Design a protein with these regions (language model features):
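Acyltransferase
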Residues: 1-106, 110-112, 161
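Flexible, low-complexity segments
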Residues: 67, 73, 77-187
Length: 187
């Protein structure tokens, strides 16, 4: 839910009374709600200065929960995105129905990773950043986990190194039965 704080807190309490789990997000504004209306003119002005291209990877629209079409390459689509409800559950369900089993969250926290896990718990959910953690290490750990779950990143473009800047130490995932951490030290 997004909107007026008093109303959303009341609705969250009512939902929890009926057994529906809720999580309050730490955000500065009521994003994806009519509360974004005051910035829409400025947003659209800036959005019209950008050049849009058809995506080369299929995208599921958060506004419909279905595969996005040409509308995703318009400023109006993105203005609607910041003002209207995000259909997160439907989006993850559609991705699940398209056999998506790995989610890599590109963002400042792991909030969406945790939310996706509640919708599709059998998939792999990988955040690329975590609050109050060393960002390069967190990103490298996420990419290592991505590799270990079946997708190999192009490492040399992600972690370039020279004799003066050797590759960083990579924390390797704990083997499931050993319970000990391993560290790979680059040469």
């Amino acid at each position: 839910m997004s909107g007026d704080e008093t109303t959303t807190l009341h609705l969250a309490k009512q939902a929890e009374k009926t057994g529906i789990k809720t999580k309050r997000l730490t955000v500065s504004h009521a994003f994806h709600s009519p509360h974004m209306q005051p910035i829409l003119d400025d947003f659209l002005h800036t959005a019209h200065t950008l050049t849009y291209h058809q995506p080369t990877t299929p995208i599921i629209s958060n506004l419909t929960g279905n595969p996005a079409g040409d509308e995703i390459t318009t400023p109006d689509y993105w203005a609607n995105h910041i003002r209207n409800t995000v259909l997160f559950h439907q989006t993850i369900t559609t991705l699940t129905n398209h056999n998506v089993v790995r989610y890599l969250e590109i963002g400042p926290t792991g909030t969406l990773t945790a939310l996706a896990h509640t919708t599709h718990p059998h998939a792999t959910h990988i955040p690329t950043q975590r609050p109050n953690r060393h960002q390069p290490t967190t990103l490298t750990t996420a990419l290592t986990h991505t590799h270990n779950t079946g997708h190999t990143p192009t490492w040399n473009t992600l972690i370039p190194h020279t004799p003066h800047h050797p590759p960083p130490h990579l924390p390797l995932p704990t083997p499931p039965l050993l319970g000990r951490n391993r560290t790979h030290r680059g040469r």
